[in-house]
Amino acid sequence: MAEQNCEIAWFSALCDDDYEFLGVPDKYLQSSWEHCRNIVLRAEEGGFDNILLPSGYQLGLDTTAFAAAVATQVRRIKLLWATRMGEDWPPQLARRIATLDRILGPNAEGTGGRLNVNIISSDMPGETIASGPRYARATEIMKIVRTLLNGEHLDFQGEFYKLKLDPPRIGTISGRCPAFYFGGLSHDARECAAEASDVYLMWPDTMDKVRETIADMKARAANYGRTLRFGYRVHVVVRETEDEARAYADRLLSKLDDEAGKAIREKSLDAKNFGVQRQQELRGAADGDGFVEENLWTGIGRARSGCGAAIVGTPDQVLAKLRAYQAEGIEAFILSGYPHAQEADMFARYVLPHINHGPLNI
């Protein structure tokens, strides 16, 4: 059987989340236009299909301004632009997406644009909304934006928004709404994803849990008459030998103060959500070296909220792990490593040439 195709994305550390030693700030790795642009350019040069531009409020760069600027610097790679639901009036969000897509330009085939959207539904500063209403609002926003960017007249009467509008004059290159990538583990998050997103993103977990989550999300989407694609967000440490990879992982934590790591985790607006709690559970279930299953190392979660584990091993081991996820239904990977520019080069050298990959077509 031929190897299935998948999308391989990297991560640009816009939120002051780049280190040589986890938890130890380095002025040369702090988020700046030059540094984060360099990560994007290295990812494009290395052959990655897509790159996540994350969103944060307390640290780093503004995602929208960065995306618009870096869109003029790249020629092939897609951008996965993160945006938080509720920070924009939905029709304005639709216009912003269309504008970014136009700046970024067409894909290699000339069949559409190169922008994807990472939908985030966390609380915002000064705002606390219960999970149910917050995800219901996100669902409404995605439906509104999709209708407008598909070039259709909008007549929407929801709980949060009541709108009658024609689509914006400026549309996307394809004339359709870009793909929505969305993640969340709670019941409300899963229902939101099933009803309105395109790619359901998972953070690191055991293979059994990945299999269980995919089955659950397929069933939920079917209840809405829809199908989902599946993505996996994970860090990676790849070296020529397993000993070298494990030694590098240990080195990342060699200067970490546990209190400093805790402070970093608690700064995040999503520090108390279901997904973060699950990452904590994985660390608690790991062995003495931090591995919760073969080649899945949870040490990174000691110094960051959110995605808290890494695939650690040789090129063959990393490739085997990715293929195992593919066999369960994962079609898109969002990878990262510390420091991000260096580790993009490592993955591009050792693993990427051996993967049948390309942009996810939705």
UniProtKB/Swiss-Prot annotation:
InterPro entries assigned: Luciferase-like_dom, Luciferase-like_sf, SsuD_RutA_monooxygenase
Disulfide bonds listed in the record: none
Alphabetized GO MF terms: alkanesulfonate monooxygenase activity
Reaction equation(s) it catalyzes: 6-sulfo-D-quinovose + FMNH2 + O2 = 6-dehydro-D-glucose + FMN + sulfite + H2O + 2 H(+)
Domain of life: Bacteria
The keyword Oxidoreductase appears for this protein: yes
Enzyme Commission number(s): 1.14.14.181
Record keywords: Carbohydrate metabolism, Flavoprotein, FMN, Monooxygenase, Oxidoreductase
Gene3D superfamilies named in the record: Luciferase-like domain
Keyword Flavoprotein: yes
An annotated GO BP: alkanesulfonate catabolic process
UniProt function note: Part of the alkanesulfonate monooxygenase (sulfo-ASMO) pathway, a D-sulfoquinovose degradation pathway that enables the complete utilization of all carbons within sulfoquinovose (SQ) with concomitant production of inorganic sulfite. Catalyzes the oxidative desulfurization of sulfoquinovose to sulfite and 6-dehydro-D-glucose.
Family, per entry: Belongs to the SsuD family.
Cross-referenced PANTHER family: ALKANESULFONATE MONOOXYGENASE, ALKANESULFONATE MONOOXYGENASE-RELATED
Annotated protein name in UniProt: Sulfoquinovose monooxygenase
